[in-house]
């Protein structure tokens, strides 16, 4: 009862002692400028070389605020029953700013940690070669192998269309080469100096010039071979030795006349040594067949070897 009476007495009094606060700008200007408190883990340095794998748990120290001595303002109830707020001091405003900045720092740190963990899950950091690159390469290779057969057929047809047909040499170039060949029928193998001169005159490459001479020599050898085969006399078992000698002499006369007419490279060949010396530098291309033809030519030109 006494307590209720006391409250009624307080309410009956005039409320003259209410607190009036100055503008907020004046209060902010009156606050002393202080440096922000440092976090306890700010001096810890993290290097990229010491980063651990994403499979391991990364425990970072939680931010700890330095102790601050401040007073907390609570709302006060005056004698008239109305609640009033006490005047905020400089320490109170500074404490509120410090707590808000600390909360912002913690939230930023937490968000950065979450984003980092998400990026680590998406693209893990391996000590060796990244496995995801190897997997992607294998997938690309598998996709190439799984291409339909029609694509390969189309690409092959395109390559055939792009590769033009091999054209013949110009007439002027062939005339220059034939002139040189007629002047060197006994030995149709140009020296290095002669090759350089022919390259300058014809404008061909070394490969083109070599291929032309290889083809020409091959044609002459085969031509000589078939000419000899067709001109061999048929030796019957009934022929006498005298008749065989006459046939051989007639065969040699026919061979010499044929060689002089066709300007063959073996026209002046009289011995096996000269023949082997003349064709010592036979081309490597289809060498087996050329050697076989040469051996048969030797046997046909020298009946004594049979």
UniProtKB/Swiss-Prot annotation:
It is found in: Nucleus. Residues 79-96 have a biased composition (Low complexity). Transmembrane segments: none annotated. GO terms for molecular function: RNA polymerase II cis-regulatory region sequence-specific DNA binding; RNA polymerase II-specific DNA-binding transcription factor binding; sequence-specific DNA binding. Residues 75-123 are annotated as: Disordered. Its main location: nucleus. Residues 97-110 have a biased composition (Polar residues). It comes from the Eukaryota. GO terms for cellular component: nucleus. The keyword Nucleus applies. Pfam families: Homeobox_KN. Keywords: DNA-binding, Homeobox, Nucleus. Belongs to the TALE/CUP9 homeobox family. Probable DNA-binding protein which plays a role in protecting yeast cells against copper toxicity. May regulate the expression of important copper homeostatic genes. Present with 521 molecules/cell in log phase SD medium. This is Homeobox protein CUP9. It comes from Saccharomyces cerevisiae (strain ATCC 204508 / S288c) (Baker's yeast). The lineage of its organism: Eukaryota, Fungi, Dikarya, Ascomycota, Saccharomycotina.
């Amino acid at each position: 009862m006494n307590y209720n009476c006391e409250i009624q007495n307080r309410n009956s009094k005039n409320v003259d002692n209410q607190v009036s606060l100055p503008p907020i700008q004046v209060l902010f200007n009156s606050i002393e400028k202080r440096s922000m408190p440092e976090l306890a883990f700010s001096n810890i340095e993290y290097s990229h070389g010491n980063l651990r794998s994403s499979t391991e748990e990364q425990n970072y120290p939680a931010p700890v605020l330095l102790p601050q001595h401040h007073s907390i303002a609570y709302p006060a109830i005056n004698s008239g029953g109305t609640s009033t707020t006490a005047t905020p001091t400089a320490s109170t405003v500074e404490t509120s700013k410090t707590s808000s900045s600390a909360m912002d720092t913690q939230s930023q740190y937490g968000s950065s940690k979450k984003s980092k963990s998400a990026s680590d899950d998406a693209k893990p950091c391996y000590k060796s070669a990244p496995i995801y690159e190897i997997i992607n390469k294998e997938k690309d290779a598998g996709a190439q192998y799984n291409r339909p057969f029609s694509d390969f057929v189309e690409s092959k047809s395109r390559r055939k269309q792009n590769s033009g047909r091999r054209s013949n040499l110009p007439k002027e170039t062939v005339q220059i080469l034939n002139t040189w060949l007629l002047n060197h029928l006994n030995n149709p193998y140009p020296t290095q100096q002669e090759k350089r001169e022919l390259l300058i005159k014809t404008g061909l490459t070394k490969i083109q010039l070599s291929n032309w001479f290889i083809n020409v020599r091959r044609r002459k050898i085969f031509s000589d071979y078939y000419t000899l085969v067709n001109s061999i006399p048929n030796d019957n078992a009934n022929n006498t030795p005298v008749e065989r000698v006459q046939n051989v002499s007639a065969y040699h006369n026919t061979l010499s006349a044929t060689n002089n007419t066709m300007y063959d490279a073996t026209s002046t060949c009289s011995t096996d040594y000269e023949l082997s010396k003349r064709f010592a530098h036979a081309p490597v291309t289809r060498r087996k067949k050329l050697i076989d033809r040469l051996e048969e030519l030797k046997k046909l030109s020298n009946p004594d070897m049979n």
